[in-house]
Amino acid sequence: MQKKVLSLVLVLAVLESIVPVSAWGTITHVRMSSEAGNPYTGFKMEYLSGSIAPDAGYIISTEWGTKFHGYYVNDALNIANKMLSLAEGTDEKAFAKGWLAHLMQDRVAHGNGDGLPKDQAYGEGYSNYAAKKYGLTHIEAEFFVNGRVIHEKGWDWDFVRFAVPTELIVKTMRSLYGSAPNENDLNNAYNTFAMEYYGELAFWNSPSGNTAYLTLLLFGTVSDYDDYVSDVHCNPYEESIYLTNHPNARSTYAAGTYIMGVKKVKSSDGQIKKWMKEYAERLEKAGAIKVNRKFEDGWLVIEFRMVDKYKADRIAKEVLQDMARSEEIFQFINLKGDEK
């Protein structure tokens, strides 16, 4: 039995669940931020935690998702800079720097299309471009790009741990808006967020995840990171990494050429996240993983440990088959021969 450890140290979690409109998927955000480099030596986990933390705001409500990201780039910079100014200690500063990284990466993925923060310098945004080109929803496009990142950019499975300071987020939001989510909402949101994240990470690292990835290549789905280069004159992946380290940089792209109206989110747009969360819950219930949840020095600590990889991979196959049976999602993955 192969044992692998994934520790998520998160400080926050949902009273309600909505369809989030994020940009790059969480896995891609972590990979980009890791490639960009952590300016705070010894606090890499705090930095990487910040690089995905803003998206959990959408689990609380659309309002807080918007307030965590900012509507335009200048709003996003103001949010991150306020958090940096309020951060106490290197650990909180590293987290705030990760939060800034997330927002700067999102501006490339969203452009002036669906999602926040908006930056018309990047046209309709890479995630929106990919979704429209391949007939996907926004969330599906992110999910598939995550799969490509893991299989093509590489992933250190044992090297993932997240730490999110609740008090810093509350303090930042109150300073900016005069109010903040309560601790219960934050804790619930990040418990949900952690299960979605771990479920997707475990899925893509399973044989069934490999099958899904190969199917993406076979059908040409989000088949080239460089598709968007001719439109915005930059590689969206590399540009996101550049902006992580140069948040005040201005693109030389001629704004306004490729502007797309905000689309209405399809009812199925959150289905993949539900599948990934349910997959993680099934893993825990089946004893394939151990999940340790505790509060530690003001942090909500969520630690995942894989204890039965064979069982986890078997459940992943069942999840992939469920996806294949969906008429709206994964319709291009034909596993009908596996149905009883």
UniProtKB/Swiss-Prot annotation:
InterPro entries: PLPC/GPLD1. Pfam families: Zn_dep_PLPC. Keywords: Signal. Residues 1-23 form the signal peptide. This is Uncharacterized protein AF_1571.
